[in-house]
């Protein structure tokens, strides 16, 4: 499953595995016959099918058109105006995302995001909600976890492409941005991450082991950036420049 887009329909032991490939080119399906009275499976079959020579259903097409129009109105909302384009891997854009997270939780000292969470650039000129959805396209929320300094350092060392704010990297150490002091291996820090990381994605499986009671803020991981952009009140006459 996951992101491999491999067309699969097969049985392994008593389990049927199904997966379609990308862009709705095909699908996998299974058929089950079940005896409810005897609470038993009578028969099962599975197959893969290609989407060929299909035609749209008018009722479905109208429904899709209705919601597409409504979505386009929402996504066209203007959030600001950027002085230049910032690529997804640009530290300035990465920093803007994680620093916006810290603004929703004054008790948090550190925020960590995986770099690949950003999937599109911030464009030059008008910035709309659609641009931010493209930038942060996944349905992740922000988690708050309690980690010791030693655990924070382990997460940064083991995770895939971390971008961190609240800490300053020196040649050999990490300093707390608020105090300028070395991170204390034994002290507990409140750290903000995204739910994908808490679930173990991109090599961050240690986080949930360190704090099995992580708090899901239920705040979408792109919302703080949206709010921050609106707060900047940027325009063509006063364009946004990321530090």
Where are these regions (language model features)?
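Short, charge-rich amphipathic segments
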Residues: 29-42, 79-95, 151-163, 219-222
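Feature captures C-terminal
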Residues: 96-243
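Active-site-adjacent helix-turn-beta-strand microarchitecture at beta-sheet edges
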Residues: 1-74, 163-164, 169-177
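A near-ubiquitous, low-amplitude feature marking generic local secondary-structure context
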Residues: 15, 50, 54, 58, ...
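Hard-cation-handling environments
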Residues: 44, 54-127
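Intrinsic-disorder/low-complexity, polar/charged segments enriched in Ser/Thr/Lys/Arg/Asp/Glu/Gln
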Residues: 29, 74-77, 142-144, 188
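Short Gly/Pro-enriched turn/cap motifs at secondary-structure boundaries
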Residues: 20-23, 88-92, 133-134
